């Protein structure tokens, strides 16, 4: 995939306000830790995550996305009528039907000819949305579009902790550990063809993207509902973290080779990378496998955890705000999502 007239003009975000430490979660798991003689502090030691953020109880997902969207509109000064598409891409959503994007679009006051829909692709949702909007722009169908997402980890972590205490086995502990890394946040990305009179000067050019998949591994990480009684369902999430990391790194290596060849880049020509945020071990193994020096990557998982689809774009926004990403940098967005899918974007910052 190659693009010649697609630009990212805003990466606006909203962080959830409730800070939850790893030690706080461990205190709730004290009976399990005592049974297996696990010392306190292991969650942070194993993941590198000391805290994450959650939305308040009763928070509606689309509210977070709406707030981020308003920030993006304020930053760019874009006329909402120019948005040819609004796509919501979170793993979490308000309901099955209608599309969560509909409430967000209504709050923004978009025009009647705006395409409004949801896209779902595990933690790669926002990247999938970016490419979907980019294709529309490159084809000349629209001049601008917005990708929005909001993720919430509170409910699934609470359910998981209850399940870990009710079924205190080492296998259940291992399959549940990844869930405890979940964080919460929202993001809005505005893309244009570069022709609109915006008030900001941000204009990061999307150059191209590569995507490879390994769907035979679709069972390694699952989040959904399971029947626990007659017409009684409970949310669950389980992850084979060891195998997921192994197969994810292998897929990332092939995608990286494809990406560099398509862009005609050497690995040394990639100035900075922004990765989906999972944890310390994942970061170390992925960067090592791709021969990327750690100083070229900007981590946020230590204080934000894994925010699903929101992690990578929020990390990019923070990296920009803190001067890590500079004008002219050749930047790669690197994402691996359950399924397995791997997606990499090339951007001239």
Curated annotation (Swiss-Prot):
Known role: Involved in olefin biosynthesis. Catalyzes a non-decarboxylative head-to-head Claisen condensation of two acyl-CoA molecules, generating an (R)-2-alkyl-3-oxoalkanoate. The S.oneidensis oleABCD genes produce 3,6,9,12,15,19,22,25,28-hentriacontanonaene, which may aid the cells in adapting to a sudden drop in temperature.
Protein name: Acyl-CoA:acyl-CoA alkyltransferase
Disruption phenotype: Deletion of the entire oleABCD gene cluster leads to the complete absence of nonpolar extractable products. The oleABCD deletion strain shows a significantly longer lag phase than the wild-type strain when shifted to a lower temperature.
SUPFAM superfamilies listed in its UniProt record: Thiolase-like
Active site: 97 (proton acceptor), 123 (acyl-thioester intermediate)
Listed GO biological process terms: secondary metabolite biosynthetic process
UniProt keywords, alphabetically: Acyltransferase, Transferase
Pfam families per record: ACP_syn_III_C
Organism: Shewanella oneidensis (strain ATCC 700550 / JCM 31522 / CIP 106686 / LMG 19005 / NCIMB 14063 / MR-1)
Family affiliation: Belongs to the thiolase-like superfamily. OleA family.
Domain of life, source organism: Bacteria
Site (Important for activity): 276
InterPro entries the UniProt entry points to: ACP_syn_III_C (IPR013747), Thiolase-like (IPR016039)
Gene that encodes the chain: oleA
Gene Ontology molecular function, alphabetical: acyltransferase activity
